[in-house]
Amino acid sequence: MTKIALTIAGSDSGGGAGIQADLKTFAMHRIHGASAITCVTAQNTVGVSQVAGMDISLVKAQIKAVADDLEVNAIKTGMLLNSEIIAAVAQQIEQYRWRQLVVDPVMVSRSGVQL
């Protein structure tokens, strides 16, 4: 049976970090990757030019959609952007009783930009 991991993080338009990197990593380990996007960044290998947070109701809806359909074996968090998103994600992790959790507190981009 294929293991399922849910990444809850930001989307990197350059593909080198965030949700995109997590999904590539899961695939390399033959783990099915699901995702909930917390924010979208305009970034590339040079830097980050813009960050936009997702509406909390949409973040929660993404997590619920995955939880209602897939048997999630592990959670990985990345850029959660603000305290409201952090609280909403924490509440849902508790609600679904997910215990296999990797927390990657992303606060600064690889290029040094504070997120």
Each model region followed by its residue ranges:
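Small-residue (G/A/S/T)-rich helix-start motifs and N-terminal tracts that mark the onset
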Residues: 1-74
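Conserved beta-alpha-beta core of the PfkB/ribokinase-like small-molecule kinase fold
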Residues: 74-77, 81-115
